[in-house]
Amino acid sequence: MKRIIITIWYSLFFSFFAVPLFADKPNIIFILTDDLGYGDVGVLFQNQRKGVQIKTPELDQMAVSGTILNRHYCPAPICAPSRASLITGLHQGHSNVRNMQFDKAIEDNWNFANTLKKAGYFTIHLGKYGLQGWGHSPDKWAGYPTKRGFDYFYGSVRHVDGHQHYPANFWEIGDNKSHQGKKEVWENNREVSSGLDKCYTTDLWTAKAKQLIIDRTKNNPKTPFFMYLAYDTPHAALQLPTTPYPDGKGIKGGLEWLGAPGKMINTAKGTIDSYRDPIYTNKGLTEVAERFATSITRIDHCVGDILQTLKDLKIDKKTVVIFSSDNGPHREAYIKGERWNPSVFESAGKFKGSKGSSYEGGLRVPTFAWGPSIIKAGQKTNSTSQFHDWMATFCDYAGLGIPARIDGVSLLPTLSGIGKQRKSTIYFEFNNQQGLYLDGYKGIRMKATSHEVDFEIFNTVNDGPESKNLAGSSEMFSRLQKRMKDEVLRIRMPNRHAKKTYDDELVPGIDIDKNKLKNGVGTNLYKGTWEWVPEFSQLSANNSLLRKDLSITNIPIKKNNGVLFSGYLLVPHSGAWTFHCKSTGQFIFKIHKKLVLDADYKYSGEEISRTLNLSKGIHPYRMYYKDSSPKPSISLQWESEKVAKNVIPANALFVEKPQS
């Protein structure tokens, strides 16, 4: 069977069929919009609201022909941390990019590009990036896309370069010099903005995407590709295209890549920032409202153009398209004397909040998946999922083991409607805001100035607007309040560049009857060859043993095999505990859901250490180990103020007794 293109208009991804069905690996395209609100899309809200509506017929058709993920969440209500979590598969409790850390280099570790590259994919990033690090050129940017697994990059690198959508043109009405001036566009190691006169970036990224899809389908039909297409609209500046959308769509119409300086695309003509979609003129809207609506309908045309291209190339039935947004709707215009308010079109739908807020309006993003014969059509799911689930999903499509370090789960069962969906960990963190889902309820605290601050608790299935705070309303919700406070400490690791008031809190143990435990270490062995330490718990064990300690002495392990140690640690006293580990192979060590030690990507055998504050009691752990040596060895040690550095003793290691 020929490969499948998974075009991700960042929303939901492919289907349960992927791994067993594909003789060749599917192509993957992920398309992410910038600041598009849940309520900005017709099928989700606009078509039902009163007054002038934003029209998105192509997106509407895409959504109803596929699966709508009605409760899909970004990890933070602003772009940089959201995009970092998307790329790395880590939520905001583990990501190295948090809060307002624009332009911070994304960590050098496994991500959705370099994992797929290991599976033979040609990897492409188009559009907005913003995770490159400091400097002025690719040789200085530590986190440049081609240094993070992308074979080809064409787009804007720095955060501010995505705020003006005519990179080669001065924009006189911008409200400051940054929003007026020209911007850089990079193609791999070459800055190319001088040839982009009158190129509106929404059109530019789309034309390049079409060109690459057509060229690779024609010239490299046996090599799968992954395309991450990240638009920089409808984020401000609220600029207009030059012309109406070109007639037609697909390979015989729509946007076209011409490739000539000054005439790079077929809409690079006329006057910049001039075309208002006539469906919004003479309707009593303000100039800024016309601009905002036009920018969204332009994206809609682009989606339809790309989908038609897939159909024209006869790869639509071998393609999955995902659509989504990085966070909720914005409040900026970047125009002299003008302001924008997302309430004009109710861009958050009926939800409370917008960009920058961890209420639903800032975090619940429009997301859906489309793929004839692949994605379950006409499905609307209310199961919760989040950005970090996409990397796991992509690995599943490519037939790869899911890296143990990441926080996500594969969404294939949801997208196909077949099989049991693993529960996603939903966690939010941004400045002093923090939240999670637990037992189906959303807990959110907007000003977590200390860990004692209570969560507001909402049932977002029945109360999307978050109008009824359930916290303290019954004994059940009082218990849930405590559990939420405990759980957020078990999910995340502190980041020294994004400090929180709760960083130094003791991580609580779990409530479990010690009489139901016995000394030992659960030890599962796995056969296989993996580029990284995989999530062994989702694989079938070749053998299961009960060991006394965390060692591989006398374990019948062969080169390139794996081991999962699991059980419970009995921590003898509360305080700071440092864990040290050194190995001939690669390993991942987790306590609760906390990623404590990560010695997988580029690990070279040195001892690594991490300190965390643990309360006295019982804490679940998992140690994932992948052997890469003919003489394997691993040593996990701990120490505290009262306990000298030593191997964790057997009397501190427990497993559950078999049920009689």
Could you say what each language-model-derived stretch is?
Residues 69-71, 376-382, 399-409, 420-426, ...:
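Acidic/polar loop patches that form or flank catalytic/metal-binding clefts of enzymes
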Residues 30-31, 37-125, 134-137, 148, ...:
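Active-site segment of extracytoplasmic enzymes that catalyze sulfate/phosphate-ester chemistry
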Residues 45-48, 66-90, 102-103, 125-138, ...:
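Short, solvent-exposed turn/loop segments enriched in Gly/Ser/Thr/Pro and often Arg
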Residues 8-18:
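Bacterial N-terminal signal peptides
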Residues 497-578, 582-660:
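Extracellular/secretory pathway-exposed regions associated with glycan biology
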Residues 35-53, 142, 159-388, 395-409, ...:
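Active-site-proximal cap/lid insertion segments
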Residues 24-29, 65-70, 117-124, 148-151, ...:
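Loop/turn elements at helix/coil->beta-strand transitions in domains of secreted/extracellular proteins
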